């Protein structure tokens, strides 16, 4: 299996024109299509894996260009930003120490995201429980966080980890999943920031959908529940190929 990973415009090692008008979901969908064409991938060999924000992109791409995809992998992303926000508010926040949550909320209310206290609380009380549960984070995670484009992240996601408040606030394709006819696996993990039961429901809405739960993982379950994640992913690809 050949795995191709690319940095989108304004991300990682790609150019960053610092033009916020380019921070647009439809444009990013066309970027995926440009990469596909350049690599000469098609329905015979193209599996699209989208994780987190990439899951939003993968769903949107499939709704427009599914004729080009052999298989779709939606990893750790719900099909509704409002439902994600609801889960963050009603479930995730209640798992946190109330005093810690109050401090985080106060910092967010004051837009004081650069305060060292903010990440100082988020990392042990949220990231280490719901983003990656390994005691020492793998180097690629640290590297990707070090290269984050904060302007882009805040523009699309919003500054807070508790739900989406940026351009994607009202994004919701839950009613359109039935239109994605491509074989699809929906992957989630017990400790993810996403709602595992909602993700399971998503798989039932896809005509050729299946669900994979990583019981010990979180948002980056390809690291913290790697055996289950990779075995399930490879099994899906082999099943579609055959």
Segments from the language model and where they lie:
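Short amphipathic alpha-helix adjacent to the substrate-entry channel of hydrolases
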Residues: 1-3
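Active-site loop/oxyanion-hole signature of alpha/beta-hydrolase fold enzymes
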Residues: 5-53, 57
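Active-site loop signature of alpha/beta-hydrolase-fold enzymes
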Residues: 11-14, 80, 194, 220
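Conserved hydrolase catalytic core segment
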Residues: 44-87
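Flexible "cap/lid" loop of the alpha/beta hydrolase fold
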Residues: 72-113
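Alpha/beta-hydrolase
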Residues: 95, 102-178, 182
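Conserved loop-alpha-helix segment in the C-terminal half of the alpha/beta-hydrolase fold
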Residues: 174-217
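Catalytic active-site module of serine/aspartate enzymes centered on a nucleophile-bearing elbow/loop
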Residues: 208-242
